[in-house]
Every structure is written in C-alpha cells, then in structure tokens.
Amino acid sequence: MCKIIAIANQKGGVGKTTTTSNLGIGLAKQGKRVLLIDADAQGSLTASLGFTEPDKLEETLATVMANIINDVEMEDDYGILRHEEGIDLMPGNIELSGLEVSLVNVMSRELVMRSYIEQVKERYDYILIDCMPSLGMITINAFACADSILIPVQAAYLPVKGLEQLIKTIGKVKRQINPKLSIEGILLTMVDSRTNYAKDISALLIENYGSKVRIFENSIPISVIAAEISAEGVSIYQHDPKGKVASAYQSLTEEVLGNE
C-alpha cells in the first residue's frame, strides 16, 4: 500500500525541499521504496539531489502531465531519475509554470497528477511531493492525489499566522475533490533552541492548532550545514551523519513511519 504525502506551505524558505529529500532518503534507509516528485517550477529538489541543471532535462513532471492531458502513452519509468541514496525522482523545472497556465482550460484539471500517480504507485511504499510555494493549480493537483499533507513551518511568528489560509485550502480540497485527505502534521523548522522565541512559537502552534492538527514532537534545528548540502547533491545523512540535523530527520522519519 503506497502512502502519498505532499510537503506544502505557500510561504517559501521554510524547509520544504530539505524536508522532502531528507525524509524521503530517511524512509529509503528504513527499506521503503520511495519516489520523490518535484512539483516546483524552480526545480530546487531536483537540483539539490545533484541534477544541477533541471531546465535542460527533457522528461520531467511537466512533460508527464502534458502527456496525460494529450493522451500520450508513457512507460512507467518515463522521466524517472535514480539517486545514489536509494530513492527515485520525478524531476521538475521551469516548464511547470507554463503547464500551470495551460491547466486552466483542461477538463478535470485538478486530477492530472493523480492520473500519473495511479500509474506508478504500485512500485512504491511512499511518494513525497515537494510543492511550490503557492496555492496554484499544480499544488491543488498534489493535494488532490495525496493521502496527507506535511506542513513545514519556520519558527517565526508571521509564517505561523499564514497557516490559516493553507489549512482552509486543505479543507476545501478535502470537501470538494479528495475526501481521504488529512494533515500528516506541522513540522517546526529552522529552530534555534537557545532562544525563548522558538519555545514561544512552539507553544503558539500547540495553542492554535494542537487540538485539530498533529504537531510533530521533533523539530528541525537551524543549521548552516542544511544549506550547504543542497550544493553537494546528497542528503544530510551522507554529509553529516552524526550531526543534530541528521538526528532530527531520523526522528521525523520514525514519527512518519509510526503514523502508517
């Protein structure tokens, strides 16, 4: 049984891509078959996994979705790249921006990505979708096929306030398109545990959302290393396996596995 998790927040810079890659590789280290989908036109996930020029790739999520719209048949492994740390990747690039515009005129436009996932999900235990920092049509496609949504939130006051709109959108998709959709949990990222501020934000999250939404027990500490690994094309487990960020993502992986 494949579980599909969208990693989403309409605010950028909150650790979505880092969380997608390190959670995905963490799951693979536990013996799970994992597909990561880069659903962001910036191609940040693709680049961070070592495919440093995503805009030069000819087979990407945009071409997959265009093929589905145009009824073009594809092999199951069309476009999939394999990473040395045991995960598969469906890359994304700038072509997703153009596709998002063209989706407006497509019948069942919210369900194009779901058609692709139905085709490949038998081969995986987990599919993680790195969403773009907006609530546009590509992100709605991700929500329409996900079982759950994991929301990374930077430990700062304003991003926490922005959660309200995202949670409302998730509720709307659940009512209108995807009744099985749930929130996997809220993950605090870039936490500086030396400050009281981070503790205040954590308390604010629990106060506002704790009764409705799971707040992950583990949070991701702020770290220069997390930024460095994007340039190396490897996960935190390979770059700094004994560090606090690797330990935090390992704990997050165990929490997600415990939520199966």
Regions found by a protein language model. Give the residues of each.
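P-loop NTP-binding core
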Residues: 1-260
